A protein has these predicted regions:
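Predominantly extracellular beta-rich ligand-binding scaffolds that present long acidic/polar faces
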Residues: 102, 108-118, 126, 131-281
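Sec-dependent N-terminal signal peptides
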Residues: 4-14
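Acidic glycine-/aspartate-rich tracts in secreted/extracellular proteins
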Residues: 60-61, 78-81, 239-246, 293-300
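Short, compositionally biased P/S/T/A/G/V-rich stretches that sit at domain boundaries
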Residues: 300-334, 341-343
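Sec/Tat signal peptide C-region and signal peptidase I cleavage site
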Residues: 16-20
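Acidic Gly/Asp/Thr-rich repetitive segments characteristic of extracellular carbohydrate-active
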Residues: 25-63
Length: 344
C-alpha cells in the first residue's frame, strides 16, 4: 500500500511539473504504469486501456475521446480553479459503458449519458467535475451518481433510474421524470429550482429532496406562491427566493422577493424560506459559495452544501506541504518532510 501511495505521489508531482513542457496522461493497468505526452495523450492512453484501467491526466486541455466505451476511471488535476492552466479540460464526451468513473475534469460543453446502440448504462459516476453546458441523456441510465459537481443544466432525468445528485451546484433542470423513477437530490444548490420566466415554468423533477438550497427565480414578482407536488418529498430544505430585474444596466442586476408562499403537501418536513441574499453573496455562481458554510469536526470548512462536503481537488494524492533542510546533519543526511493528502 505504501509503495502504491508513493508511486502515485511521484506520478502526480511529475504530471503537474511536466505541464510547463506539455500534457501528460498516465495509464495504470495492474502494476504497470505507462505515460503518454502531448495534446493526444488522453486519446493514446484510452486506446491502450482495457477494462479496469485508470487514466490520470495532468492540467491542461486535451483532445477528446468522443465516446468512452471501456469500463475505466479517468481522473484529472481539477475542474474548478479559475486559472485554466490548473484545470484538466476536455471539450465534451459520451459515456457508453457501465462502471465508468470520471473525476476532476472541466468539460467545456456537454457530457452525455448513454447512446442509441445501448439498452442502458449502469453504475457511472461524475465527481468533482464542472460542465460548461449540460448533463444530457435521452437513454436509460441506472445508478448514476453526480457528486460535488457544477452543472448549468441537468437534462438527464426522463429515463433515469436511481439517479443520485449530491453536494453539487445546478442552475436548472430541463426535462421530466415520472412517479416510477423519482431521483434522490441532497445537499445541493439549485439556483432556478422554481424558475418562472416568460410565463413558463422550468421542469421540476420528481425526487426526494433533502438538505438543499432551492432557488425560486423569476423575471417578475407577479407570482409569489408555489405548490410542492407529490410524489416528490422535501425535508430540511431552504427555499431562496430571488428574481432578476428587467433593467440589465443596473449596477446591481438582482432584486429580491420579500416572500414566497410555499404550499407544502404530504411528505414535507422542516423546510425553511429565506431571501436569496441572506445566504449567498453572489447569485448564479458555479459552484455556489453560500455564506456561513458548515464546518467539520476539525473546524475546517466542510463545503458550501454540508453533507459529505465539497472539495475542488480530486481523489489522488497531492503534496500540501514540504520542508527540506538546507544543510545536512552530523550523519551527512538531509531531512525532508512531505505532507500528502488525498480526498475521499
Amino acid at each position: 500500500m505504501k509503495k502504491i501511495l508513493l508511486m502515485l505521489v511521484v506520478l502526480f508531482t511529475m504530471s503537474t511539473n511536466v505541464f510547463a513542457d506539455g500534457l501528460t496522461a498516465t495509464l495504470q493497468q495492474g502494476d504497470v504504469m505507462t505515460p503518454f505526452y502531448g495534446v493526444n495523450a488522453f486519446k493514446e492512453a484510452y486506446d491502450a486501456a482495457q477494462d479496469g484501467a485508470i487514466i490520470t491526466l495532468s492540467s491542461g486541455k486535451f483532445n477528446d475521446v468522443s465516446t468512452i466505451s471501456k469500463q475505466i476511471t479517468i481522473t484529472g488535476a481539477s475542474a474548478f480553479f479559475a486559472d485554466n492552466s490548473e484545470r484538466t479540460i476536455l471539450e465534451s464526451t459520451t459515456i457508453a459503458a457501465n462502471n465508468i468513473k470520471i473525476e476532476g475534469i472541466y468539460f467545456l460543453k456537454t457530457v452525455t449519458l448513454g447512446t442509441s446502440t445501448l439498452s442502458r448504462i449502469e453504475n457511472c459516476t461524475l465527481k468533482r467535475c464542472q460542465i460548461g453546458s449540460s448533463l444530457y441523456s435521452n437513454h436509460i441510465h441506472e445508478n448514476t451518481l453526480v457528486d460535488q459537481c457544477a452543472i448549468p443544466s441537468v437534462q438527464a432525468m426522463e429515463k433515469s433510474k436511481n439517479f443520485c445528485i449530491k453536494n453539487s451546484t445546478i442552475d436548472h433542470f430541463y426535462g421530466m421524470n415520472s412517479a416510477t423513477n423519482i431521483a434522490y437530490i441532497s445537499n445541493c444548490v439549485v439556483w432556478k429550482f422554481v424558475c418562472y420566466v416568460s410565463n413558463t415554468y422550468y421542469s421540476l423533477p420528481y425526487a426526494i429532496y433533502k438538505n438543499n438550497y432551492l432557488g425560486i427565480y423569476k423575471s417578475d414578482d407577479s407570482k409569489k406562491y408555489f405548490t410542492l407536488d407529490s410524489p416528490s418529498e422535501y425535508y430540511n430544505n431552504v427555499f431562496c427566493p430571488s428574481y432578476m430585474k428587467r433593467d440589465y444596466e443596473d449596477s446591481d442586476p438582482y432584486s429580491f422577493i420579500e416572500y414566497v408562499t410555499i404550499n407544502y403537501g404530504s411528505g414535507c418536513a422542516n423546510n425553511d424560506n429565506i431571501k436569496g441574499n441572506q445566504k449567498f453573496e453572489k447569485l448564479l455562481e458555479q459552484p455556489a459559495h453560500p455564506i456561513d458554510a458548515p464546518l467539520g469536526s476539525d473546524g475546517t470548512v466542510v463545503g458550501p452544501y454540508g453533507g459529505t462536503g465539497f472539495s475542488e481537488y480530486p481523489a489522488i494524492p497531492r503534496i500540501i506541504s514540504k520542508s527540506i533542510d538546507s544543510n545536512s546533519n552530523a550523519e551527512g543526511k538531509i531531512n525532508v518532510k512531505i505532507t500528502v493528502k488525498a480526498e475521499q
